Amino acid sequence: MAENAGFISVPWGQHKLGAMYNTPFPSISRPKCIGVCSINASREFVDDASCASYLAGQPWPPLPFDLNGGIEDVIRKPVENGKRDLEIMLTYIKQHQKELLRQSSSDARNLRLDSDFVTLRGILRQIMCLQYDNRSFRVKATLLNGNVYMCKEETPEQQLENANMSRAQRVMCSWGFKFEQYLTSAQAQGKPVTNVPVNEAEEFMGVYRTNLAGILMLYGAELDCVDSKEPVDFKDCRVLDSLKFVELKTSVFNMNPHQIRTFKSFKSANWWSQSFLVGITTLYVGLRDTKGMLQRIDEIDVATLARNKPWSASAMAWYLEQFLRNLKKLLVNINDPFAVVQVTFLNKHASYEVLRGPEHQILPNWYRDLLKTRS
């Protein structure tokens, strides 16, 4: 029987920035997109591709262009807890239960997924980068019918950081959304529409499967746009798996030495892992000055991000694999479908606490009912 509190073993010391790391990359299948959905302006789940965007046909708007356009009228994404992101995935599973759910081999009265983990790409990315990051991070997980469901939870440090975010910081966050507006269109080969406020609440999400060293994962990932000259039938799974999605990023034009070090040690690792987890091979990076004027657009091959960097892509993948494997082992030992394990990464430790009670649940009752589980 597992303790109600303790530590999860993760390889914090396996690699230090700049050191050699010779362990080969763990086996991993190519991430496969099995479906898509949208989150509309009201933050409601929509089982279609209505929020999808296409990479706009070139030539793009002439440079430089102003990322501050319409900044006062931006429609910002409301503050939500991590359970809400997971619930979007659960709603997708409900809508596609015929394809995704099957009888549990251990109890025919219950249904389960062909996955060890159900989560979000952003959580996997952050876990991969944790060994190089001193900031705190927290997840909650529960085991139901053999599947681990995992969402994020804000730490006190993150809550304080978000509460104290300055207007200038919020504006810089909005620059990234405005850059997306300049480079995307609602139609294939369409032109960008940049004279309307950016709606940061809308999302287009892909649902992916992959196998990391025997750990099967099902996760959602927000996608910026698809690079296609023809309209896409997002309902066709064969088409989905062959699409070329691209990521759009903004960064600093003419970086100073500190910014260059930060990019090489941290930001490039985040960009690489985010793209790697969904099989994206191309980034378009808008380089902007301190006033939000975009000066240049670079096309970057994602594979080059991992070259000649102080971090190790292999170490990041092994860190994720070890954490997921040991987290599931802990949950299996706890053997309680209503127990929630809260894991806090802080000061090079991954401490856990077992939480019980309705106030701690991360799975809504309707989802438990869907899987025929009763308390």
Swiss-Prot record:
Entry keyword Nuclease: yes
GO biological process: mRNA catabolic process; NAD-cap decapping; nuclear-transcribed mRNA catabolic process
Keywords for this protein: Hydrolase, Magnesium, Metal-binding, Nuclease, Nucleotide-binding, RNA-binding
E.C. code: 3.1.13.-, 3.6.1.-
Residues reported in the UniProt entry to bind Mg(2+) 1: 180, 224, 247-248
Pfam families reported in the protein's UniProt record: RAI1
Ligand binding (substrate): 43, 120-122, 222, 249, 274
EC main group: hydrolase
Presence of the UniProt keyword Hydrolase in the record: yes
Obligatory cofactor(s): Mg(2+)
Catalysis performed (reactions): a 5'-end triphospho-ribonucleoside in mRNA + H2O = a 5'-end phospho-ribonucleoside in mRNA + diphosphate + H(+); a 5'-end NAD(+)-phospho-ribonucleoside in mRNA + H2O = a 5'-end phospho-ribonucleoside in mRNA + NAD(+) + H(+); a 5'-end (N(7)-methyl 5'-triphosphoguanosine)-ribonucleoside-ribonucleotide in mRNA + H2O = a (N(7)-methyl 5'-triphosphoguanosine)-nucleoside + a 5'-end phospho-ribonucleoside in mRNA + H(+)
Coiled coil regions, renumbered to chain: none
Gene Ontology terms for molecular function: 5'-3' RNA exonuclease activity; metal ion binding; mRNA 5'-diphosphatase activity; nucleotide binding; RNA binding; RNA NAD+-cap (NAD+-forming) hydrolase activity
Binding site for Mg(2+) 2: 180, 222, 224
InterPro entries hit by this protein: RAI1, RAI1-like_fam
GO cellular component terms given for this protein: cytosol; nucleus
Cofactor note: Binds 2 magnesium ions.
Organism domain of life: Eukaryota
Family according to the record: Belongs to the DXO/Dom3Z family.
Function: Decapping enzyme for NAD-capped RNAs: specifically hydrolyzes the nicotinamide adenine dinucleotide (NAD) cap from a subset of RNAs by removing the entire NAD moiety from the 5'-end of an NAD-capped RNA. The NAD-cap is present at the 5'-end of some RNAs and snoRNAs. In contrast to the canonical 5'-end N7 methylguanosine (m7G) cap, the NAD cap promotes mRNA decay. Also acts as a non-canonical decapping enzyme that removes the entire cap structure of m7G capped or incompletely capped RNAs and mediates their subsequent degradation.
Quaternary context: Interacts with Rat1.
Name the record gives this protein: Decapping and exoribonuclease protein Rai1
Natural source organism: Drosophila melanogaster (Fruit fly)
Record gene name: Rai1
